[in-house]
Regions:
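Contiguous segments within soluble domain cores/interaction surfaces
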Residues: 2-119, 123-166
Length: 166
């Protein structure tokens, strides 16, 4: 059982945190996350594709939905991206403002273009008032496909990231 007066009793509360390709905001204010992802696959196909993945950029949207509970007013919100090597940098930093009833909240939408230099798991760490709320994983996979050389053909052709799988 939760302690009386604990942070869990007061809010704000995390309702959702996810990565998707895009977010639709309907006229009635309802949001729809399109193509929720937790993996991006980068491919290189050719007679001699690179052994290691070349860096690439990828567009994605981070959706965070918070409900106020008893919290009111402005609260510092940030998201740090942690690479597979443990290097961290802020990718979203803003103020979440809570007003109204305890079931009211804020949708924080971070549209970003991220450069991926390495294969592995990248973590999106979500903080409110410097307290961790959650971590969202995104795995980057590199697929290298060697094809036989045909007459007049040379090298390789890097492919755009394939459709991510979730």
């Amino acid at each position: 059982m939760a302690e009386t007066g604990s942070q869990f009793d007061k809010g704000p509360y995390l309702s959702a945190a996810l990565l998707c390709e895009r977010l639709l905001l309907e006229q009635d204010g309802v949001a729809s996350a399109i193509r929720i992802i937790d993996r991006v696959t980068r491919t290189a196909v050719g007679t001699s594709p690179p052994e290691k993945m070349d860096p690439f950029e990828y567009n994605l949207t981070l959706v965070t939905i918070l409900k106020a509970g008893w919290a009111q007013g402005a609260h510092a919100f940030r998201v740090a991206l942690v690479s597979p090597l443990g290097e961290s940098r802020n990718v979203v930093q803003q103020t979440a403002f809570f007003e109204g009833g305890e079931d009211r909240g804020v949708n924080i939408i971070g549209r970003m273009r991220i450069r991926f230099d390495l294969e592995g798991i990248y973590w999106f760490e979500v903080f409110l008032e410097e307290k961790p709320l959650t971590r969202i994983p995104l795995r980057v996979v590199y697929l290298r496909t060697v094809t036989p050389r045909s007459p007049g053909q040379s090298g390789f052709s890097p492919q755009n990231p394939e459709f991510p799988t979730g």
